[in-house]
Amino acid sequence: MKNIMRNKEVKLFAVIFAVFIASMMLFATTAHAATVTTKNMPSKSVCVGSSKTLAKPNVSGFKWKAINNTYYTLTTAGKLTGKKVGTASFSVTCKNVKYVYKVTVKNRPKLNCTSKTIRVTEKLNLKVLNAGNSTVIWTYKNPKVVYDGVGYGPGTTTATARCAGVTMTCKVTVKDYNGSLAKKMAPKANANVLSAFDKLGFKIKYDPTVNYGGCFNAHERTITLRFVGDNTIYHEMGHFLAFVAGNVDRSSDFAAIYNSEKSKFTGINRSYATQNATEYFAESYHDYILQPTETKKKLPKTCSAISDAVKKVTPTRVARVKEIYGPFWK
């Protein structure tokens, strides 16, 4: 009888234990499913035919999975490659978190042209098509030929645009300006001064690599400027005027004017402009052209000297300058 009771107890215990184990397994399964959460990750974009490597979230054990859908492919190394324009999401589950990524595939950016010819001081006007809201970064191989999208000097160079992971290039040829560059870039200067500049064979050059704003060189017959469109050209034209009028900035008469009125000069380049009579004459010409009324009021003697210098630039004077300096000019 005791054996029968013991067998029943054993069987009952076995049934209870089995039910307990089953319930624990069910609870464990239910609890695991309930703790999975979804986390939307920052959207990604890629262009058709382009690739980028996605950065993993800072989660231990996270691994990319291989995906090949209509719009893009993803490798286990995280390399995302665009196939067709469109949008699709994928997810990766790691440690009870479902990471969801929305991927948009866009048209590949391209330049509006792959070769272009412009002249010095002209804008390149290249455009990136299909750029959308993506940032475009421009670089130019030779800044002495093209700088900041503007022709700076004759020659050939390459313009490069980088946008949305795509690199595009355009061959650019820059030719000399067809006409008087002095008249184009310093249109407010005195007509006879500009005419003398051209007749004596002087040239304007641009070089963004120099460490100064402008430089007049009578021996080389050049005005070198750092930036296209800078009003510094009027300062350098002041140097040219002084030279062609007979180096009037170095005369004793102008030295007396310089000493009497330099303290009245209030331009933004005051320290540089008043260091000597030569720079004072050039910068005063700059103001004489661009701010005539104010400058004549503040510096009457200086402006009178500049006006006299302008009057000296006659065809006869130009011919004389050419006769004297011609043998030294190449």
PLM regions and their residue ranges:
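Intrinsic disorder/low-complexity segments
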Residues: 10, 14, 20, 47-48, ...
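Active-site acidic/histidine clusters and adjacent loop/turn architecture
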Residues: 182
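Gram-positive cell-envelope targeting signals
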Residues: 1-35
